[in-house]
Amino acid sequence: MKKRRKATIALQCRLRFETQEDREAVLYLMRRFSSATRFAYQRLLEGMEGREVRQRVAALFGLNDRYAHGALTKAKAILSSCQERDQNPKKVVFGGRRLFEQLKRRHLSGKRRAELKRAWRERRQGLLFAVGEKGNRGNQNLRPEWEESRLFLRISVGHRRWVRAEVIRKAKREKDRWDLLLARLARAEATGEWFPYTVTLRLREGQIYAFISFEEDLPPVSVTRDRGVIGIDLNAFPHHPAWAEASPDGNLLAHGAIPLTGMEGLRKAERERRLWLAAYEVIRLAKAKGKAIALERLKGIPRGQRGDGRPGLRRKLGQWAPRSLEEKIRILARREGIEVVEVSPAYTSIIGSLKYAPQFLLGAGVGPTRALEPFWRDTRQGESRI
């Protein structure tokens, strides 16, 4: 029997406390948990076993076993992230290196320095994390509860004491995943069949926000490479996704591009919105054509360096995020049951520009997408021509 495909969904909401005393109790707990995470990280660097770290964290910071487990889990995640990116784990700055470097500048003063110090304290001391478990109504320490059609988050602050905060969040659109979470919570309350959900509390600009993450069952893959693929070049010139449709035998059927210009100078939220719209357009195209998606295995995209004489190009490359767009396409494809094929990017730009672009009268951005297609057919046997 095949295992069900699952995807993790993370949802954000704001918390409103009933009294200032409850809010201060949670802030004090967040400061202790943040310190416990840093302590656990240092002990892991020293080579201490996880079980011993967990016991020492619980005893030293007055946290229950589940909070201590959460601090250890966070510390392990930070350590593994450094190792995956080939970074020195001893140089991690809790609170953010960019803020740390800004605060080191002696010429900052007044309101600007006060804002940076507040942001530094919030990022360094404003964290609380509890891993979900199915046996304890989904989560032992941070648990949503209903009362008179209102949703509250029950927070364990230690010594068998709990405080409650009202969850402030409304569904923003018709298919908002927040409605899915509320439906699953209501069903679990009625049937007693709970599901694990992980809750993270963070302090941002004086407000406490909760991030609730849980797993969602995905539909089986129904759109496969058997009917052909749509090759996507995420870093086509000039910084837009280009696509080319191929038949099962590899012949070109159609091609085009998804306009994504004017990204430079935009705020991060607006850039993310445009990237999501582009990803939805790719998925809409794949569903309409009934074909799988072929993507390049992108790593280490050059963005230029200071002194190369092209500051304008460096600025554009710095604000263009093909990896972010790739991740969004993968997320949406999993939800829609569309297969995503990875191919090696070696020489696709050269082959596309020198062979397929003149042969099929394609542009410089669309040619490499045509070069992706001869390679996906061999991935059926786990092979690659390049």
Feature roles, as predicted:
Residues 1-386:
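Nucleic-acid substrate recognition interfaces
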